[in-house]
């Protein structure tokens, strides 16, 4: 299915998917995925934006998904007299947790299964002085023979 790129911009500070937790209840282990910390709200917002931008059926072809995660600056990173460039984000959340939350949120809206996402880049940055925190997701199909080396 030839397709133009789909670009989604999700406003707000990026969030990572919390890792599954295990607890012992009555001598039995029970595993659950925590959903606090705004995760459910982020997923709902991402799904709403995706449904507005992409109105076709969920894709069932190999996909490339690139993600740019722009985090807010801390007070210690604020400058008053000089331009503030983007900085690499070297603290949590880990990039795999950021990616997992985005892929899970868009499953069933943009693609049938996140296993269809075969490649893509991720970048975590701290916002430049004039940037707002956000997550930018760029989705494109992979043409036959077009896989990256």
Predicted regions and their residues:
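Acidic, proline/glycine-enriched N-terminal capping motif
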Residues: 1-149
């Amino acid at each position: 299915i030839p397709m133009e790129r789909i670009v989604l911009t999700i406003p707000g500070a990026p969030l990572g998917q919390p890792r599954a937790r295990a607890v012992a209840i009555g001598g039995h282990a029970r595993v659950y995925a925590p959903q606090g910390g705004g995760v459910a709200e982020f997923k709902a917002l991402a799904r709403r934006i995706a449904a507005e931008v992409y109105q076709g059926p969920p894709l069932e072809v190999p996909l490339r998904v690139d993600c740019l995660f722009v985090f807010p600056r801390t007070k210690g990173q604020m400058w008053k007299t000089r331009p503030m460039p983007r900085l690499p984000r070297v603290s949590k959340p880990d990039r795999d947790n950021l990616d997992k939350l985005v892929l899970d949120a868009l499953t069933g809206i943009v693609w049938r299964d996140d296993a269809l996402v075969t490649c893509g880049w991720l970048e975590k940055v701290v916002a430049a002085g004039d940037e707002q925190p956000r997550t930018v997701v760029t989705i494109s199909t992979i043409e036959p023979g077009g896989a990256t080396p």
